[in-house]
């Protein structure tokens, strides 16, 4: 099974592909029940893989580095390890990684690698039922403002050093920073199709297990979790999110061409 550890130690020269240990919420809090009805849990077979976002009844958005050959999708979940009557299970009929994402990086990530275009659309095999606990979220129409307070959510590890998924969906509030902050912090390229968000004092972050999940700034979906540093939550090292305003045309075109 292929999965990429995208959260890299700052001094690391490169990293090989490894079993799924994705990005997580660190220093956050239990999300209010059903407060994130667009949140998706993406599984590879029966193993939790990544987060995702419901865009409409037929489409889920996640990170391209979450690519696998089979998926199980859960909608409307609050608890990762418990059955919930309101949750919905779906399969994926086809996946659409962004064509400009460098898929060779699923094997290894050398120093200076460019992880731009880290997004993927998943076409559900059966439309989601829209309910009080399963709702899509709109794509952004304007650029996010620097300094905005953003909310990230996911079931990634709540332990900084040991991979430990929580049962309850976690939320964390973080700030949006100029990309120059992340350029100084990371050994990989930071480009204009990325967002830089986190707490400069450390302690609050996404990390292993949150990849593909939403970043909502001032109430608007602006990003999905992409990559960052290990250990997560270090001072002066915000994480990287795919900047969705740069990709709305591709997302809409892909959805329209694959009804």
Curated annotation (Swiss-Prot):
Glycosylation (residues): 102
Protein role: Glandular kallikreins cleave Met-Lys and Arg-Ser bonds in kininogen to release Lys-bradykinin.
Intrachain S-S bonds: 31-171, 50-66, 150-217, 182-196, 207-232
EC number(s) recorded for this UniProt protein: 3.4.21.35
Name the record gives this protein: Kallikrein 1-related peptidase b22
Organism: Mus musculus
Propeptide: 18-24
Matching CDD domains: Tryp_SPc
InterPro entries reported in the protein's UniProt record: Peptidase_S1_PA, Peptidase_S1_PA_chymotrypsin, Peptidase_S1A, Trypsin_dom, TRYPSIN_HIS, TRYPSIN_SER
UniProt keyword terms in alphabetical order: Disulfide bond, Glycoprotein, Hydrolase, Protease, Serine protease, Signal, Zymogen
Signal peptide: 1-17
